[in-house]
Amino acid sequence: MKKTTLLVILDGWGYSDSDYFNAIKNANTPTWDSIWQEFPKTLINASSLEVGLPRGQMGNSEVGHVNIGCGRVVYQELTKIDKAIEEKTFGDNKAIGAAIDNVIKNDSNLHLIGLLSPGGVHSHEEHIFEMIKIAKQKGIKRLYLHAFLDGRDTPPRSAEKSIKKADKLLQDLNLGYIASVCGRYYAMDRDNRWDRVEKAYNAIVNANADFIYDSALEALEQSYARDQSDEFVIPTCIKKDGHLVKVQDNDSVIFMNFRADRAREISHAFTDESFDHFPRKKHLNINFTTLTEYDSKLKCAVAFPPEQPINTLGEVLMKNHKTQLRIAETEKYPHVTFFFNGGREEQFEGEDRILIPSPKVATYDLQPEMSAPEVTDKLVAAINSGKYDCIVCNYANSDMVGHTGNYEAAMQAIEYLDKCIARLKDAILEHDGNMFITADHGNADMMVNPETQKPHTAHTTNLVPFVYVGHKKAQVALEHGKLSDIAPTLLNVMGIAQPKEMTGKTIFNFEK
């Protein structure tokens, strides 16, 4: 019977001494409190340069899991694209050049789709603005921006500033206009809510929407009047001089998001010949280009293809003939699989995966426990089975409920998680295993912005916990650690040599 090493990633569980609308600190968490007092622990970095992001940039789930799973600082797409813009090589990119050439050759339209936001988690509006300028320089005559609105990694009603910037730039360049707006709730689903994606797709491609207005700003104002914040803006078309924009054959579409997980579904709707999740009028003959690779199965050009890291934690475990399990509910399943494996879709030999469906609710404050009880049932069974050397799991609650801005619901989510942690602790200690608890970034640790007194729905840049639960004696060996130090720590406790590609350091030393 194997002694399991378990890594528990509490998504969005940051650390803050402040009790100001801190759902984690103010929730009733007897198990977490006792673990924090009794077992070896430290705080580690999960944002900024320490995870390969620009200085001061908050971390996110994709970045966090890549850094944890790879055991090294992985420089993120945001950083790479920023560098290309800074070095003035962005416009020389082959895939972007081909998309522009297609438009010029066919005298067709260039469509930019993506999250118009300064959030820096899924996209950055500066990339969109740079793309607009390059299109003008390259001789594009008609450019249409289909703006997805944020309100999740940014304040809930903050899109006006971004829309005004985009409007002014397009007007100054006499190039085109914002042709549709849509909350990310619709265009950037990742939970197979194809009815949402269908609404976004139809607005962009067919100019078919529930609402039509004369400007993007008017669309936003009317959405607010319906009490729909940026994230939930119903897909809306913009009519200019009596004209509605559609995506037509021979057009080029460039998807400006750099993060994969919430860009996949609508990309498949654009590109799959045999797409069947909702009816399309026809399969478009277009040039579809993505800023980064969203899914290796997508048939499209990629401007910044991925670099495949070697000797990730999963690969090292496989090479050492260890069994491993990855488990999460739908919202975070790609993170413990694709992202944790450094952008690899395929399972390693000896790697099992369990996907627990996320509850079908409009927003997760309506069901703060999400699917944590079911995840825990499967986890406890896996520990008891003695089948796995290493288990990696993710609990989505503190992030997904944190994003709703509902403080009371976030506290309920934390309290549900505390009960789950109690069950895991008992199972691990009973079987003489090792459990590490950490987070990929903060979120529920600040539910209200202290400066504005408004709901804070974005991630935080706070440190995150890293705690060891087990019978081994452990001492903190590394102060000021970071997410990339977690994999070396797991290898250390498992007695496996750390490969040279892993540049992280072990956080705890364990008595032999």
From Swiss-Prot:
Monomer. This is 2,3-bisphosphoglycerate-independent phosphoglycerate mutase. It is an enzyme of class 5 (isomerase). GO terms for biological process: glucose catabolic process; glycolytic process. Keywords: Glycolysis, Isomerase, Manganese, Metal-binding. GO terms for molecular function: manganese ion binding; phosphoglycerate mutase activity. Substrate binds at H122, R152, D153, R184, R190, R259, A260, D261, R262, K332. The active site is at S61. Binds 2 manganese ions per subunit. Gene3D superfamilies: Alkaline Phosphatase, subunit A, BPG-independent phosphoglycerate mutase, domain B. It catalyses: (2R)-2-phosphoglycerate = (2R)-3-phosphoglycerate. It holds the Pfam family iPGM_N. One of its GO terms (cellular component) is cytosol. Its EC number is 5.4.2.12. Mn(2+) 1 binds at D399, H403, H459. The lineage of its organism: Bacteria, Pseudomonadati, Pseudomonadota, Gammaproteobacteria, Thiotrichales. Belongs to the BPG-independent phosphoglycerate mutase family. Mn(2+) 2 binds at D11, S61, D440, H441. Catalyzes the interconversion of 2-phosphoglycerate and 3-phosphoglycerate. The keyword Metal-binding applies. Pathway: Carbohydrate degradation; glycolysis; pyruvate from D-glyceraldehyde 3-phosphate: step 3/5. Its cofactor is Mn(2+).
